[in-house]
Amino acid sequence: MGRMRGEALAQEVLRLKRERNAVILAHSYQLPEVQEVADFVGDSLGLAREAQRTRAEVIVFCGVHFMAETAAILNPEKTVLLPDLEAGCSLADSIRPEDVLAWKAKHPDGIVVAYVNTKAEVKALADVCVTSANAVEVVSRLPQDRPIYFVPDMFLGAHVARVTGRRLDLFPGECHVHAGIREEHLKALLEAHPGAEFLIHPECGCGSGCLYLKPDAKMLSTEGMVRYAKGAEAREFVVATEVGILHRLKKEAPEKAFFPVKPDAVCEYMKRITLEKVYLSLKEMRHVVRVPEEVAGRARRALEAMVAVG
């Protein structure tokens, strides 16, 4: 995309947005040029809340499919557009409704906690949904005497179990990007930047190993990372998550330096959303995300419980 072309396209997107009474919501892993035209950039929890709060008639969701589904479930009266319907999620794809039903059959009094990175059909079977920003708080409030099934991210689940001291049954799912971030990637960076603070996303595969290397690591959601980096005294940060967050970190804390643990930790699904696709989506009102009401109605309860916490 040439410079003029990029700027002209961005102007067209903003013009169409006004014309359609639309709001553009973007996840922190989106391409920088997509983040720049968004009305709000944030994590799953912030985006879900913003979708609930908006007065716009149209929500253009620059993220992956389950996020647009979440916005559609929370706003049945609004039009939700996903600029590329192929923007999926390996973690959300890892679990099926049958997996949850099988566990429920064995644990009729059990509680199913679904990470927001799941399809609507799985959320519909959950008692509560969580994001990485509020999973610890939600789980710590659950009744002590009932079994809990945490799906689908086993690394986030292990982190929640570690912090809350609760015994959780974990589904063996993972995000392929975060699971690929390992201790060996971290070691060299920490040696090169001995004074740097270490920010790690709880989906990372190296959770316990990385904490062993750097016991004072901060395990945070993407929003938590931005908030922490802005307020911390440290000038250098080593960051373990998808690299799209670096644009936002540098923008919101320009005087600080950020080093990705794995510079090629890129979610190809997130990067499917381009400025051109945002433009076409708004221009033609294409790629509307709809969730059948019999699924949405059940999933809505679990999502509303999530949005209320943290």
Swiss-Prot record:
GO terms for cellular component: cytoplasm. Its EC number is 2.5.1.72. Keywords: 4Fe-4S, Cytoplasm, Iron, Iron-sulfur, Metal-binding, Pyridine nucleotide biosynthesis, Transferase. It holds the Pfam family NadA. Its cofactor is [4Fe-4S] cluster. Iminosuccinate binds at H27, S44, Y115, V116, N117, S132, H201, P202, E203, T222. Its main location: cytoplasm. InterPro entries: NadA, NadA_sf, Quinolinate_synth_type2. Catalyzes the condensation of iminoaspartate with dihydroxyacetone phosphate to form quinolinate. This is Quinolinate synthase.
